[in-house]
Amino acid sequence: MLIIELLKAIFFGIIEGITEWLPVSSTGHLILVQEFIRLNQDKAFIEMFNIVIQLGAIIAVMLIYFERLNPFQPGKTAREVQLTWQLWLKVVIACIPSILIAVPLDNWFEAHFYFMVPIAIALIVYGIAFIWIEKRNAQQEPAVTELARMSYKTAFFIGCFQVLSIVPGTSRSGATILGAIILGTSRTVAADFTFFLAIPTMFGYSGLKAVKFLLDGHHLDFAQVLILLVASLTAFVVSLLAIRFLTDYVKKHDFTIFGKYRIVLGSLLLIYSFFKFVF
C-alpha cells in the first residue's frame, strides 16, 4: 500500500535529517535501518533513494545560512562581500579531492563496502578517532577560530578528509569535522565549514546518482516520485532542527559523545552480523 510506503519514507527522512549533520553516518544508518524496514521497491531505486533524499538536508543548510553565503546580500560591506567570495573559493578548493578521487571510485566502493561489516568497522574506527582527538586537544587552543582565518591549503586538506567518507559508515560530516579539528580549527569552524562544503558535494553526488539511475534505463513512477518528495521534505524539516542543535552543541561540548555512540553502535552491528552469519 502506498500509505505504508509513505510512512516508511517519513521515517527514513527523519533518520536522514538527524544523521546527515551529526558525525555518525547517514548512509550507514539508512543501510542499517533497511535491514529491518525496507521500501517495497527495487534495489536500483533504493540505492538512488538513499542518496537523493539528501537534497532536503542540503536545502535546509542553504536556508539557514543564506545570508551568510550570499555575496549579493543587501547591506553587506565590501569587506564582507570579499570574505563571502573567499569562503566560496575555499569550498570549491575543498571539493577538488572528491572530484578527482571519490567520484571515479564511487561505484567500486558501492559494490564492495555497502554492507554491514564495513559499516560497523568504520563506525568503530572513527569513533575511536574522535575520542582520541578530543583527548589530545583537551589542553590545546585551536589555531583557527574564524572561517576567515582558514587558509586555502587547510580547506584543500579538509576536502581530502572528506574523500574518506566514500566508505559507508565513515560519515561525510564526521570525516570533515575530524579533519578540520586535526588541522587546527575550532569545533565551531569545523562544523560551519562542514555545512558549507555539503552544499556542492551533496548536490553533485545526488545529481550523479539520479542521472545514473535514469541512464541505466530506470524510470520513476508516480508512487516513487511521491516517496522521494515526502522523504526529502521530512529530511529538510528535521535537518533544520539538527543543524541548529549541532551548532549550539559544539559551542559548549566536544564530540566525545558521538565517538562513544559510534563505538557502541558499531560493536552491536558486528555482533548482529556474526549471529546473522552463524544462524
From Swiss-Prot:
PANTHER family: UNDECAPRENYL-DIPHOSPHATASE. It catalyses: di-trans,octa-cis-undecaprenyl diphosphate + H2O = di-trans,octa-cis-undecaprenyl phosphate + phosphate + H(+). Belongs to the UppP family. This is Undecaprenyl-diphosphatase. Coiled coil: none annotated. It is found in: Cell membrane. Catalyzes the dephosphorylation of undecaprenyl diphosphate (UPP). Confers resistance to bacitracin. Its EC number is 3.6.1.27. Its main location: membrane. Keywords: Antibiotic resistance, Cell membrane, Cell shape, Cell wall biogenesis/degradation, Hydrolase, Membrane, Peptidoglycan synthesis, Transmembrane, Transmembrane helix. The keyword DNA damage does not apply. The keyword Plastid does not apply. One of its GO terms (molecular function) is undecaprenyl-diphosphatase activity.
